[in-house]
Regions:
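Short beta-alpha connecting loops at secondary-structure transitions
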Residues: 83, 103-111, 133-134
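Glycine-centered, small-residue-biased loops immediately flanking beta-strands
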Residues: 79-80
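Short, well-ordered coil/turn residues at beta-beta hairpins
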Residues: 57-62
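C-terminal hydrophobic helical "lid"/dimerization subdomain
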Residues: 15-27, 39-48, 53, 66-73, ...
């Protein structure tokens, strides 16, 4: 099967490619591509990758009209555009090719996360080996919850892991090295995450929970 990831930030694209390699995907029968759509003709590039057939499913993760138009343009026959990222602007709109809705069976769906059954399925998949560590970019304690929740739209990165029995400011994993210059705990956590390709991991979690007074 074909899977293409696009973004306009090359650093993010490179990071994703280092975590989820094309070789690993190929071993599971997936033809994985990473494409920077910030330059050139992204529609032509993506259509070429698909062999000119377009895509069965296109997931739009940002409420940007130009991105929606690109997604619409690369749908294949009976293709589904999944608008995942909900906009804040109640007047948000974007052009959509309704000729293809009628003649090419294109359709649109909006999702904003999963239900309880989806969560159960996700937990089951994790138990079977799916690793969610690549999603986590920040670690914090219970005292960080309020500010993190209120300022979430302004905090970059991915998921924030909160340990409710710890007192710890929300801390980016990428900041461990700098913090480790003055706090040995963070130096040790930095060593552990670097040993796991920069990812939060059970070893680091165990160490953190065993040294709550050193945060």
């Amino acid at each position: 099967s074909l899977f293409v990831t696009t973004v306009i930030d090359q650093a993010r694209l490179d990071r994703a490619a280092s975590l989820y390699t094309k070789e690993r995907a190929a071993s599971k029968g997936i033809d994985l591509h990473y494409v920077n759509t910030g330059s050139g003709d992204p529609v032509a590039t993506l259509m070429e990758i698909s062999g000119g057939n377009g895509y069965d499913d296109v997931v739009v993760m940002a409420p940007v009209p130009a991105v929606i138009q690109q997604a619409d343009a690369i749908l294949g026959f009976d293709g589904c555009l999944n608008f995942f990222s909900g906009p804040r602007n109640a007047e948000f709109s974007a052009p959509f090719n309704f000729y293809n809705v009628h003649y090419a069976a294109h359709h649109l769906v909006g999702t904003s996360g999963g239900n309880v059954d989806d969560m159960k399925e996700a937990i089951d998949l994790m138990g079977k080996g799916m690793d969610p560590a690549g999603l986590i970019t920040h670690i914090g304690g219970l005292d960080a919850v309020i500010d993190t929740t209120l300022n979430l739209p302004n905090i970059p990165g991915g998921k924030k892991m909160i340990y409710t029995h710890l007192t710890m400011p929300l801390t980016a994993i990428s900041d461990f090295a700098e913090l480790g210059k003055t706090k040995p705990l963070y130096a040790e956590l930095d060593r552990m995450v670097k040993a796991h390709n920069g990812l939060w991991n059970p070893e680091a979690e165990t160490y953190l929970l065993a040294h709550p007074d050193e945060v």
